[in-house]
Amino acid sequence: MSRYRGPRLRIVRRIGKLPSLTNKTSKKRKSPGQPATSFKRKKKISKYNIRLKEKQKLRFNYGITERQLLNYVKKSRKKKGSSGRFLLTFLEMRLDNIVHRIGFAPTIMAAKQLINHGHICVDDKVINIPSFICQPKSIIKPKKSTVSENVIQKNIESKELLLIPPHLSLNKKNLEAKIIGLINRKAISLIVNELLVIEFYSRKV
């Protein structure tokens, strides 16, 4: 399954807030003539659909394909400890996510574009693979070019950026970020139950 490239707010309406996909929030529209308050019977949601929704949150928030997410789940289940925690760590340590979280790009999709176009360096080496897994102590900065530096400087000055999590540090003057360590679960901005995602794939792994 390929990445979703349609209207972002449509996804937000369906599965909830996705901070890395878009900063915009969805407002429910009322049909003409619809009363201010209407009571509708809530349909009982199956366990499968609950797990599916949590899985979709990860897919859309981190901008990954179904195959990529499945591979991360497989890797996580091979680790000793909480599979759900390892899954989130893999996703958070992706280069595109790091680029977004440090403010070099306003969204995960914008981060992917920066990386694909060769604007980002990791430890002084240009990396053009969004799924590249970063390591603690790595240094992230723009390529030494006026174009790359200007694009990132403009993004950093935006008022719509998310708060930088404590496992990352940013020197705005030098346009240089450092990965201090692995992310703490509490610092993950997405509201998701990662254990339900592991359960969703339990029969496929």
Curated annotation (Swiss-Prot):
Disordered: annotated segments: 16-40
Could you tell me which residue ranges the S4 RNA-binding domain spans? 93-161
GO cellular component term, pick one: small ribosomal subunit
Question: Which Gene3D superfamilies does the protein's record reference?
Answer: Ribosomal Protein S4 Delta 41, Chain A, domain 1 (1.10.1050.10), RNA-binding S4 domain (3.10.290.10)
Where does it reside? Plastid, Chloroplast
One GO BP on record is: translation
Select a single GO molecular function from the record's annotations and give it.
Answer: structural constituent of ribosome
Task: Return any one Pfam family short name.
Answer: Ribosomal_S4
Keyword Cytoplasm included in the entry's annotation: no
What UniProt keywords are attached to this protein's entry? Answer: Chloroplast, Plastid, Ribonucleoprotein, Ribosomal protein, RNA-binding, rRNA-binding
State whether keyword rRNA-binding applies. Answer: yes
Say which family it is in.
Answer: Belongs to the universal ribosomal protein uS4 family.
User: Quaternary form?
Assistant: Part of the 30S ribosomal subunit. Contacts protein S5. The interaction surface between S4 and S5 is involved in control of translational fidelity.
Q: What is this protein called?
A: Small ribosomal subunit protein uS4c
To which species is this protein native? Euglena gracilis
